[in-house]
């Protein structure tokens, strides 16, 4: 292994660890800021902010853990020779963290749908919109839970077909989220619309990435494995494997394909999670909303 390749891997890992420290500091600052302004929030809004902050802590800590002990799940590759790097622990932490992140979005949609129900004029159209958004808020977590189950299937069996379903469900969830935000657009406070537009743009980009890059990539990997006659593990065999086996590798060739998504996942997604705890009231009173 060339020294340059090793240096690339270690530099990337150093970046991940630095981002993890920054994220903890950013969350701490957000918590301090929210606590400082707690008297300005109505009781129900303050309760939502506290839940958002707690869920964000789960995501921040989960991503921080995975930054310190990176794991390439299906290949069982790690950077640190320790049980803390095991796929079993890494995937368990990831599952909890991702459920926390999904719960943040579900909580946000529920809060916004309730605001819309209270503030919108009582028309059939507005009632349908708030009900639709509320339905999406209730479906997000179950959908992500199913996605996590398929992720575990792939990790345990080493078949990438589960990842195809998993990433498809994540893309579907993001599309439903964007659709919900667009439904609420007419009732969003005029000064909050740039924030909603940013969320919609980011969500649409994510859906496009999942549909045109991520899902096809996993499908191609699965097709290649099928063509080569790869032997897959049973879930029971996989559970033993992820608990006991990991391969230490600092080769840049092994990690290069994971660098972009892992770096973005452990940075931008975490910052978004923290920001969700700071989101102000978005739905305007009927007299303030502008079409």
What are the residue ranges of the model-derived segments?
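Hydrophobic transmembrane alpha-helical segments in integral membrane proteins
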Residues: 2-27
